[in-house]
Amino acid sequence: VRPDVNALADLQGQTVAIPFWYSIHNIIVQQMLWQAGLAVVEKNPQAGQVRLTVMPPSDMVAALAAKQIGGFIVAEPFNALAEAKSVGKILRFSGDIWRDHACCLSMMHDHDIQSRPEWVQNVINALVDAAAFAKHRRAETAELLAKQGIRHYTPHDAKVLRAVLQPEPIVWQKYERTGAIRHADWQQRRVDFQPFPFQSYSELLVKLLKETHLAGVNTFLNDVQPEKAARELFDTRFVEHALQRDGLMSSFGLQSLQRQKTFAL
């Protein structure tokens, strides 16, 4: 949010940017706004209302600096970039509301899964290995991904990526003091890596999506059953096999492939 925003109530009459209507970010921010007694609208926000608008993540920091929006919710490192440029601050971390929530996932064509499962398995193995590397070698990952890195994987500065992947303890303590982190006992990371799509997460995702304001035609959600959707959308065979290699379950801190969902505003 902008530096002058200290509470959700300060966002009434303003615009908040989201990356996509069907994003985890939209779900979480609407839950936050509703708890604060604020209504979501798509245009002309009045008192007690907040306008949500879809915006490319790369445009969000500039829009915040220009005071075109009061805040945004999106994946890193754009939040850290706003902090680094002193145009924004963290009001709340999404992982402090929905514990261990997923952000991104990997999609495969059914044709590939059916016709070349070995190739699919190799792709998933590589993704799991990369996640394990990034989880345990955070500073090195920041350097590899930075614009200063040999392959220039991202346009982001190494300092910004380090703030995301391996923030200084004093900075983390500041977040606890300001209330950006309210569940310190969850021991959440600003960004973490975990490759398994838990059934409980997927069910809650669909359930909350059905409660969320979405632009456009979305009546198809009326007939979607959370439990059935969670079962049918994910083929976990490949990631389960990948996790059985070389003690990767313990590398990700997984004792089983079952988990209870935790959502607390």
Region annotations inferred by a language model:
Residues 2-84, 98-102, 203:
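Bilobed "Venus flytrap"/periplasmic-binding protein-like clamshell domains
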Residues 10, 21, 43, 92-93, ...:
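Residue-level detector of family-conserved "landmark" positions at structurally sensitive sites
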Residues 53, 106, 195:
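Residues that recognize and position ribonucleotide moieties
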